[in-house]
Amino acid sequence: MKKTIEISKLSKSFPSPDGEETVHVFNEVDLVVEAGSSVAIVGPSGSGKSTLLNVIGLLDKPTQGSIEVNQQSLGSLSDKEVAEYRNQTVGFVFQSHHLLPSCTVLENVMVPALAGFGKLRGSELRNRATELLKEIGLDHRLSHLPGQISGGERQRVAVARALINNPSVLLADEPTGALDQSNSNKLIDLLNQLNEQKGVTLLMVTHSEHSANQMKHAYHLNDGNLNQQR
């Protein structure tokens, strides 16, 4: 079994607002994600799902424990290595798409590659962005602004943007949270399609049992503990 993500005894806590107590978000979490797999972490709002994903994505720091991604320890990376990791090793999809309103769909997809760490430039970058939009069925929207397309389409653009630098891991934080059931189903189908065709490892957090059931494996996070469901 080739491991993409390996987490050992990972914990996250922070002081309460009055500073008198310690709030434990999750406690000594262990998780192994196989390369090319799709995994859902499901749980109620406030259970720490997004915090766990942020820690894996190096958007937040753990209190203790270790994380390895592609057999690289994330505990001692330099600031430059952290930036490269966020931009190249992992791709992020959030509940809110955060598309730039004054940029076209095509330009939005290219943004991460233009941030300084992408390997493609010029026509090669444009061609890759166009191909990604074709794969998600939006190559007819290249010159549209985000406000000119539907909410479901905007979230699919966010998926294409997350893949522009060819990451090995896709981290999705409640990606269907702002969508109706029809568009939610379409987005989950798209994520599974990309997981199968591109071999990108998919780790998704969601409060939806229905969405979690579409992944190959599912874990439940509640009361600070992570338990495998299947």
Q: What is each PLM-predicted segment?
A:
Residues 4-5, 10-221:
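ABC family nucleotide-binding domain
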Residues 218-230:
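H-loop (His-switch) and adjacent beta-strand-loop-beta switch element
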Residues 1-2, 230:
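Short, Lys/Arg-enriched, disordered terminal segments
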